[in-house]
Amino acid sequence: MKKEYWLERWRQEEIGFHQREINPYLSRYWPELQVAPGKRVFVPLCGKSRDMIWLREQNLSVLGVELSPLAVEAFFKENGYSPRHIIGEKFDQWDADGIHLLCGDFFDLKKDHLAQVDAVYDRASLVALPPETRHAYTDHLLCILPPAIRILLITFDYPQAEMSGPPFAVSTAEVEALYGKRTDIRLLAKFDVLTENPRFQQRGISRLQESIFLLMTRTA
């Protein structure tokens, strides 16, 4: 799945993946990470997610990365911010009220970009990626994160043959395969959510689950 695919989705406003409300699992399970106020949270492939507003309201600094400048601009405009905009070589940076968004390719991130990060929130990143890209994504993420980081990960799982993603199906077994060698994985909850998602029913899905994981990167 090429970068142009996502840029075109934003240009055409084909953003059914965007949630207008705060994700309920975020407020319910974020305390499990035990992140102190004032710490910094990284939100990969952040889009214009309002979850970043909730994180900021918890007195956390937010660092997001997003490919589409339209998404970044929309986030600040729709939430009433007047950001400072700094043009860079690999990333343009937008800053306002403790929220810092880097506009560019996730795979161009370096350790220096995430040096001050204390936790990660991934609701829509891993499930946005096709199977052939997920290993590269998780390898790069774990490579550039500081040690001893906690990650709140939310995934979808459904019979992949019944629908072409995104969002793609990511099973518990795949989470363990992607992250198990370098993190400790704890399944916090799993819910059957098909009846709450008619758009998936309309596409012929017979089963839909959401899982919430707490991942803890190992120090060695």
UniProtKB/Swiss-Prot annotation:
InterPro entries: SAM-dependent_MTases_sf, Thiopur_S-MeTfrase_Se/Te_detox, Thiopurine_S-MeTrfase, TPMT. It comes from the Bacteria. Keywords: Cytoplasm, Methyltransferase, S-adenosyl-L-methionine, Transferase. It is found in: Cytoplasm. Transmembrane segments: none annotated. Its EC number is 2.1.1.67. It catalyses: S-adenosyl-L-methionine + a thiopurine = S-adenosyl-L-homocysteine + a thiopurine S-methylether. The keyword Methyltransferase applies. S-adenosyl-L-methionine binds at W10, L45, E66, R123. GO terms for molecular function: thiopurine S-methyltransferase activity. It is an enzyme of class 2 (transferase). GO terms for cellular component: cytoplasm. GO terms for biological process: methylation; response to metal ion. The keyword S-adenosyl-L-methionine applies. Belongs to the class I-like SAM-binding methyltransferase superfamily. TPMT family. HAMAP family: Thiopur_methtran (MF_00812). This is Thiopurine S-methyltransferase. It comes from Nitrosospira multiformis (strain ATCC 25196 / NCIMB 11849 / C 71).
